[in-house]
Regions:
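Amphipathic, non-transmembrane alpha-helical scaffold segments
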Residues: 59, 63, 67, 92, ...
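Hydrophobic/aromatic-rich alpha-helical bundle segments in the mid-to-C-terminal region
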Residues: 110-114, 125, 129, 147-193, ...
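Amphipathic alpha-helical segments that line or abut small-molecule/effector binding pockets
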Residues: 64, 89-104, 158, 162, ...
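Short amphipathic alpha-helical elements of helix-turn-helix/winged-helix folds
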Residues: 19-23, 98, 102, 167
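Helix-turn-helix
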Residues: 11-15, 19, 23-57, 61
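Amphipathic alpha-helical linker/stalk segments
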Residues: 18, 64-93
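Short secondary-structure transition hinges
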Residues: 101-140
Length: 217
């Protein structure tokens, strides 16, 4: 049976995105050519432009899709945590575990989302950055709730949120399935570290750590 034009177009667009992810992750955005992408997809170069007007538009689509999917996945999977039915500490634990699980399952998307921000045009950069802020604000809201109810000791919500996200996302640079630690073990240990970051008063502990380093060995 012949495929409809619509379904064929959607399948082609999906193949373009999948091949673009592989090529950009392995070669870099600047090095990837639309001709090379067309060859990987198995279409003529002109066919690419029926789906994406420019190479820049394709990159923006990949990064916007990654952030939208991330936001949707959190809202769908952990809607009960978002609605305040759980304590802030439980929501923070759920957020940390979700972030790890989602990101290690999509290493190419994560790599491109962070390493190719510099390749976006100003308009696309601002659009992607707005979605990133939406996600960051989810974590900030959890941290603020914990401060308000007295369960967290945090001097700077923004700084702590950025530190947590950097630590959690950094897992994708070294984690590989089949390694020494399972995904569940990584989730558990990193969630515990995130919890300590929120519960401990990091601001007050820094001078103590500095003094400890100055002691003669």
């Amino acid at each position: 049976m012949a495929r409809t034009i619509g379904s064929n177009g959607e399948e082609t667009a999906a193949r373009i995105r999948a091949c673009a992810l592989e090529l950009i992750a392995s070669q870099g955005f600047e090095a990837m050519s639309m001709r090379g992408l067309a060859a990987a997809v198995g279409v003529q170069s002109a066919a690419l432009y029926h789906h994406f007007a420019t190479k820049q538009a394709l990159l923006a689509d990949l990064m916007m899709s990654h952030m939208r999917d991330l936001l949707t996945a959190w809202q769908t999977t952990f809607a009960d945590h978002m609605e305040g039915h759980a304590a802030a500490s439980d929501r923070l634990d759920a957020f940390a575990r979700f972030h790890i699980r989602y990101h290690i399952s999509r290493p190419q998307e994560v790599f491109i989302a962070y390493m190719e921000l510099r390749s976006l045009s100003p308009v696309h950069y601002n659009a992607v950055s707005e979605l990133r802020r939406d996600y960051e604000n989810l974590l900030k809201a959890i941290l603020q709730d914990g401060v308000d109810d007295g369960s967290f000791q945090i001097d700077d919500i923004h700084l702590t949120a950025m530190a947590i996200l950097a630590m959690l996302t950094g897992i994708t640079t070294w984690y590989r399935p089949g390694g020494r630690l399972s995904a569940s073990a990584v989730e558990m240990q990193y969630a515990a570290m995130v919890r300590r970051m929120a519960v401990d008063d990091i601001g007050e502990s820094l001078p103590v750590q500095k003094q400890a380093k100055q002691r003669p060995g």
